[in-house]
UniProtKB/Swiss-Prot annotation:
UniProt xrefs under SUPFAM superfamilies: ATPase domain of HSP90 chaperone/DNA topoisomerase II/histidine kinase, DNA mismatch repair protein MutL, Ribosomal protein S5 domain 2-like
Gene designation: PMS2
Assigned keywords, A-Z: ATP-binding, DNA damage, Endonuclease, Hydrolase, Nuclease, Nucleotide-binding, Nucleus
Record carries keyword Nucleotide-binding: yes
Domain of life the protein comes from: Eukaryota
Lineage, broadest ranks: Eukaryota, Metazoa, Chordata, Craniata, Vertebrata
Protein name as catalogued: Mismatch repair endonuclease PMS2
């Protein structure tokens, strides 16, 4: 066996990374965002036993983050290890991790913050007479230490977060408002779960005044904290969570055996919004989950809660606060750097408890209706007593509970079962009365898809033999065009047609299809094809070479075309058509006569001039010209290669998705990849199909475009961009009870709210949650809007501040208007109107779907692939 050749470079030895580099690398993985930085500092204050925590931000946290508390403070002997990596007082070894009850235990937060920013800490322990101010370098070492007068507690100041990582710092500053909104969401969770702790957060932009972000009063329970953060109005829509053991059906769903379930493993408390429509929220911005009072993001729990809620209110999401208490030995919190992903031992049991409890809560007495009649049976018939046949089907009784609480004729049914009954009844009645579809005939100028596909398929294609006499073809009466019956193998480009599909009578066997390529030059040497005679004939009857809007009536309007018996035999055209044929035919006849030995006679000898060459002496200037046959051959070879390359590119199958609902996503991706906006203006309009679709051609690809869907999407986007909704003034200003952060978002995006028809009065001197009052609401005919649309708009602007956006109900209104004002299916369009619709597709952002989700455009065939086959 041969030895490997020695490497010219010396082998790189494995070495330990220096401590400073390790520190900077790992620190960037601990503190990931503004929210993480604030979270770590607030958790330190809570671990120190603080009852009063103040968070102060400058420029949304980009300039300064300062957290002050009245906790126990830091003893002087712990100053050195306060900001060193993996120095902590919470645990001593790994076994202590199982029983840890504090938020922090790794000793990484302050050390990482030192590596990413400039950290200053002032602290005063309860045993010290005076406080101390400490300044740290990026390695966590103390650079300055001085006495500092302050009360018991600790203040940590973070300046220029991420400035040691230039790329992240620039990205952080660019998205500071998004980071700020996420930070507030995290801080709200600690405000809710921290009982007896007053948390206050303010933000100062530039040299302006401080604006409150969130504030709590240190309430003794969850309910008071929720009211302090989100206002008393939010409390009115909440019901307490009532824990129930999982029933047999749910246990079977999760594969649990009721006999083997541990008892009292989980204790769940909290609140959730009622499932009545209008009580929930349009987004998931107010969902808080805690495990042992630690904020977390349990993905499966979140999914389950929303799914159960959607069974009763499918258009909204619940407000929910859930605290799940479980033995610390059954939990692993050391999973991710931010400790928000938590692993549980008996997770299926937790999900079963939650599902059973939520279903029972939403189906409880709060959401029951009293009805006088029996429920619908499964097929939608009413089961009523014999004597009640003439009574109303469902009779709501508002006084049933007070007037006759023990009535036997009344049944109690839940909202969910009532909705199910109604949906069954309505579904059945819907299918029993289908709508009648009105069919219309197209104008005589429109091309049928059969004509288009057959003319471009090949010049040797032959129509079916079944036909009627040419006498009917000569008729000047317009023939109604029928629709295509079937298109087979749309990917390969072949289609199956019949006489009924084509919409007109075809010639007998042997007749050839009129070629589309009438504007291509005809080769003189090969002109025996019947198609070329018909092309020349079409020219003589006055048809434009560029026009593709010829109907089959053309063949029978002014010049009569005799029946063709055999395509290989010479066609007997009328005399007027034969005379009008160019010199191609005459040349061919003379050649045949010459072969037969018949020479043409000279009719006029006086006009006959002999051809004699006469020598003429001309002075010529000779210019030498460089010529290389080799260079010419090389150039020809390159041109041939380039043409072959272009042909291969054209024959490449760029569109593979079928026209099927299951392949909509694939088809959209292909169109988005292959079609750019400027290509729509270059598309050639072939015609209209079925009074509802436009057939367009780009290079060698045929596309079918829904005329209604594409016009609807264009109108929708124009309404979205340019419509300013008119507002209706309120009689008296309405208090919105917004949170401090939502007030800030609204004030910063007032212009966007005004374009949506909302107007407010701002009182900067009013207390938090009372600064903004609504004075105008948008109204538009039958559409009305309210505070829930403001909440949705605030949520959207929290993620994309300053970007023009619309609430979902405004989008629905625009979609409805765009649909009504668009070109309808069944409307005949001329070429200019179709071209306008196709060109508009290149002027909008998302041309592939209408606002209601229908596709606007699909690829139907590639002509190159059809020709090659």
């Amino acid at each position: 066996m041969e030895e490997a050749a020695p490497c010219s470079e010396p082998a790189k030895t494995i070495k330990r990374i220096d401590r400073e580099s390790v520190h900077r690398i790992c620190s960037g993985q601990v503190v990931l965002s503004l929210g993480t930085a604030v979270k770590e500092l607030v958790e330190n204050s809570l671990d120190a036993g603080a009852t009063n925590i103040d968070v102060r931000l400058k420029d949304h946290g980009a300039e300064l983050i300062e957290v002050s508390d009245n906790g126990g403070g830091v003893e002087e002997e712990n100053f050195e290890g306060l900001t060193l990596k993996h120095y902590t007082s919470k645990i001593q070894d790994f076994s202590d991790l199982i029983h840890v009850e504090t938020f922090g235990f790794r000793g990484e937060a302050l050390s990482s913050l030192c590596a990413l920013s400039d950290v200053t800490i002032s602290t005063c322990h309860k045993s010290a007479k005076v406080g101390t101010r400490l300044v740290f370098d990026h390695n966590g070492k103390i650079t300055q230490k001085a006495p500092y007068p302050r009360q018991q507690g600790t203040t940590v100041s973070i300046q220029q977060l991420f400035h040691t990582l230039p790329v992240r710092h620039k990205e952080f500053q660019r998205n500071i408002k998004k980071e700020y909104a996420k930070m507030v969401q995290i801080l709200q969770a600690y405000c809710i779960i921290s009982k007896g702790v007053r948390i206050n957060c303010t933000n100062q932009v530039g040299q302006g005044k401080k604006s409150p972000v969130v504030s709590t009063t240190g309430g003794p329970n969850l309910k008071e904290n929720i009211g302090a953060v989100f206002g008393k109005k939010q409390l009115q829509s909440l019901i307490p969570f009532v824990q129930l053991p999982p029933n047999e059906a749910v246990c079977e769903e999760y594969g649990l055996k009721s006999t083997d379930l541990p008892e009292k493993l989980y204790s769940i408390t909290g609140f959730i919004s009622r499932c009545d429509h209008g009580v929930g929220r349009s987004t998931t911005d107010r969902q808080f989950f805690f495990i042992n009072q630690r904020p977390c993001d349990p993905a499966k729990v979140v999914k389950l809660v929303n799914e159960v809620y959607h069974l009763y209110n499918k258009h909204q999401y619940p407000f929910i606060v859930l605290n799940i208490c479980v033995d610390s030995e059954c939990v692993d919190i050391n999973v991710t750097p931010d400790k928000r992903q938590i692993l549980l031992q008996e997770e299926k049991l937790l999900l079963a408890i939650l599902k059973t409890s939520l279903i029972e809560m939403f189906g409880s007495d709060v959401n029951k209706l009293n009805v006088n009649q029996n429920l619908l049976d499964i097929v939608g018939n009413v089961k009523a007593p014999p004597g009640d046949a003439e009574k109303p089907w469902v009779e709501m009784s508002h006084h049933s509970e007070t007037e006759n609480p023990s009535s036997e004729g009344k049944r109690v049914m839940t909202l969910s079962r009532l909705r199910e009954s109604f949906s069954l009844h309505q579904t059945e009645s819907y299918f029993q009365s289908p709508k009648k579809v009105k069919q219309r005939h197209s104008s005589s100028k429109q091309l049928s898809l059969d004509t288009i596909l057959s003319t471009v398929r090949t010049q040797k294609a032959v129509l079916s033999e079944d036909s009627e006499s040419c006498h009917e073809m000569k008729s000047k009466m317009p023939v109604p065009r029928k629709y295509l019956r079937k298109v087979d193998d749309i990917d390969s480009g072949f289609c199956s047609t019949s006489e009924s599909d084509a919409g007109y009578n075809t010639p007998e066997a042997g007749s050839c299809v009129i070629s589309e390529s009438v504007n291509n030059p005809i080769e003189e040497e090969f002109c025996s094809s019947e198609e070329q005679h018909q092309n020349e004939y079409l020219k003589t009857v006055g048809h434009s070479e560029k026009s593709l809007e010829c109907d089959i009536q053309v063949l029978g309007t002014e010049h009569k075309l005799n029946r063709v018996n055999d395509c290989n035999n010479q066609t007997n055209l009328p005399q007027e058509a034969t005379n009008s044929l160019p010199r191609v035919r005459r040349f061919k006849n003379e050649a045949d006569d010459f072969k037969a030995g018949i020479h043409p006679k000279v009719e006029n000898t006086r006009n006959y001039m002999p051809c004699v060459d006469v020598l003429v002496e001309v002075k010529k200037k000779t210019v030498p010209l460089e010529f290389s046959m080799k260079a010419l051959a090389e150039r020809v070879r390159k041109i041939v290669q380039q043409q072959q390359k272009c042909t291969e590119t054209q024959n490449y199958r760029r569109f593979r998705a079928k026209i099927s609902p299951g392949e909509n996503k694939v088809a959209e991706d292909e169109l988005r990849k292959e079609i750019s906006k400027e290509m729509f203006a270059k598309m050639e309009i072939i015609g209209q199909f079925n009074l509802g679709f436009i057939i367009a051609k780009l290079n060698s690809d045929l596309f079918i475009i829904d005329q209604h869907a594409t016009d609807e999407k264009y109108n929708f986007e124009m309404l979205q961009q340019h419509t300013v909704l008119q507002g209706q003034k309120l009689i008296a200003p309405q208090n919105l009870n917004l949170t401090a952060v939502n007030e800030t978002v609204l004030i910063e995006n007032l212009e966007i709210f005004r374009k949506n028809g909302f107007d407010f009065v701002i009182n900067e001197n009013a207390p938090v949650t009372q600064r903004v009052k609504l004075i105008s609401l948008p109204t538009s005919k039958n559409w009305t809007f309210g505070p829930q649309d403001i909440d949705e708009l605030i949520f959207m602007l929290s993620d994309c501040p300053g970007v023009m956006c619309r609430p979902s109900r405004v989008r629905q209104m625009f979609a409805s208007r765009a649909c009504r004002k668009s070109v309808m299916i069944g409307t005949a369009l001329n070429v200019q109107e179709m071209k306008k619709l196709v060109t508009h597709m290149g002027e909008i952002e998302h041309p592939w779907n209408c606002p209601h989700g229908r596709p606007t455009m699909r690829h139907i065939a590639s002509l190159d692939l059809i020709a090659s086959e």
